[in-house]
């Protein structure tokens, strides 16, 4: 009898360990990242994000977490912000996620900021990124017409309202990237926001920021 007990003891000990410490019996699953909604700029489309989205995929981000949204860029940024609100709700419903990250290029920074500030976006957005965003205006917008371009001009009523008070409201984590060689959004200081992490890239053109590998790495670290 004693020999049988001795033989059964190791199995009994293993069974007790599994009951007492179940978390050690299986590895914890890796949480899926927040979905990313990419917001392009003026006279562009969602395809402008192909390079950056491809880098996210190569790093293991699932396709259903990457949304290259397209909208009519000539309309008012307030109109675009309302459409963005609907897109964010669609993505959250489709993925079951609690919040998204917004990654914006150029004028896309303005509609996404309007959404955060005025349409309840801070409750649904964990991290926000502005790449070469004319957050305080750019004189290059005087060379184009229509509501969107008018709103991008320094001193516009749209920008004055957007930048009055807290430029980075809510618990959303804000970050901006500006290039010293951007000839469309200048000076580079127009990109920075009070309360955000404001960074300067290498000498990149306006349409190169969202295609640059180093910028992608920084963006991934910020939203990750």
Model segments located where?
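A short, Lys/Arg-enriched amphipathic alpha-helix followed by its capping loop at the start of a domain
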Residues: 52-61
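Serine-dependent carboxylesterase/thioesterase catalytic core
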Residues: 34-40, 60-63, 69, 74-168, ...
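Secretory targeting and sorting signals
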Residues: 2-27
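C-terminal catalytic-base region of ester-bond hydrolases, centering on the histidine
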Residues: 151, 159, 167-224
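The serine-hydrolase catalytic nucleophile loop
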Residues: 45-51
């Amino acid at each position: 009898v004693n020999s049988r007990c001795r033989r059964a003891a190791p199995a009994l000990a293993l069974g007790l360990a599994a009951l007492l410490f179940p978390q050690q019996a299986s590895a914890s699953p890796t949480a899926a990242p927040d979905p990313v909604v990419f917001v392009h700029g003026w006279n562009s489309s969602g395809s402008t994000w192909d390079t950056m989205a491809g880098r996210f995929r190569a790093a293991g981000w699932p396709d259903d977490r990457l949304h290259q949204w397209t909208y009519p860029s000539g309309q008012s940024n307030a109109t675009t912000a309302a459409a963005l609100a609907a897109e964010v709700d669609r993505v959250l419903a489709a993925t079951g996620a609690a919040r998204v990250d917004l990654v914006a290029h150029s004028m896309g920074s303005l509609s996404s900021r309007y959404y955060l500030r005025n349409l309840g976006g801070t409750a649904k957005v964990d991290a926000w990124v502005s790449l070469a965003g004319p957050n305080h205006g750019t004189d290059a917008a005087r060379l184009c017409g229509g509501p969107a371009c008018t709103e991008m001009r320094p001193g516009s009523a749209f920008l004055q309202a957007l930048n009055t008070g807290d430029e980075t409201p809510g618990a959303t984590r804000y970050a901006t990237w500006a290039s010293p060689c951007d000839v469309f959004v200048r000076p580079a200081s127009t990109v920075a926001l009070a309360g955000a992490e404001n960074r300067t890239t290498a000498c990149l053109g306006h349409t190169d920021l969202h295609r640059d590998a180093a910028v992608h790495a920084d963006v991934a670290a910020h939203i990750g």
